[in-house]
């Protein structure tokens, strides 16, 4: 991997879309997401085929996550679809390393705007290298998750043993 990385605006890498109200929709199989994650399922999708990155517009603005299509997002959550050949996992890694709270545009409830997201300056390589880097970090995140589960299980076992040691 020796290609030159270019400084670009995040808005050049993604399309930023707004969530919408879901209350007029019937129950179904399409997951609805808000800033806190999964909420319920409805009958229609805002994004049928394109996976995206969810980022809070209001409330929790510093916890991006990947949305697998099809999905619906509420109006407090933007969904960002990588443009052209930009890699979803690579762009997600960028999102995870941005100090979103420092871009809060409110005096009350934390808020982000499409403009604030679009203007963020990032370094990005060509799409082939993005794909390799994105896949590497996806696998790394998976390993972290597996080890975290194991750690949680061991902590629960320790707690159980300590509670029952003197019974």
Which ranges hold each PLM region?
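Feature detects amphipathic, helix-rich regulatory segments
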Residues: 1-167
């Amino acid at each position: 991997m020796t290609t030159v990385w270019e400084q670009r605006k995040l808005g050049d890498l993604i399309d930023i879309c707004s969530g919408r109200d879901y209350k007029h929709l019937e129950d179904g199989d399409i997951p609805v997401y808000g800033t806190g994650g999964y909420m319920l399922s409805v009958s229609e999708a805002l994004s049928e085929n394109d996976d995206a990155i969810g980022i809070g517009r209001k409330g929790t603005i510093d916890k991006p996550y990947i949305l697998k299509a099809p999905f619906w997002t509420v109006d407090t959550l933007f969904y960002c679809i990588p443009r052209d050949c930009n890699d979803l996992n690579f762009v997600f890694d960028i999102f995870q390393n941005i100090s979103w709270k420092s871009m809060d545009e409110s005096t009350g409830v934390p808020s982000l705007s499409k403009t604030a997201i679009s203007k963020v300056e990032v370094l990005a390589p060509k799409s082939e290298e993005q794909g390799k880097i994105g896949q590497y970090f996806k696998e790394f995140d998976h390993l972290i998750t597996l080890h975290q589960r194991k750690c949680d299980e061991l902590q629960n076992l320790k707690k159980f043993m300590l509670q029952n040691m003197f019974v």
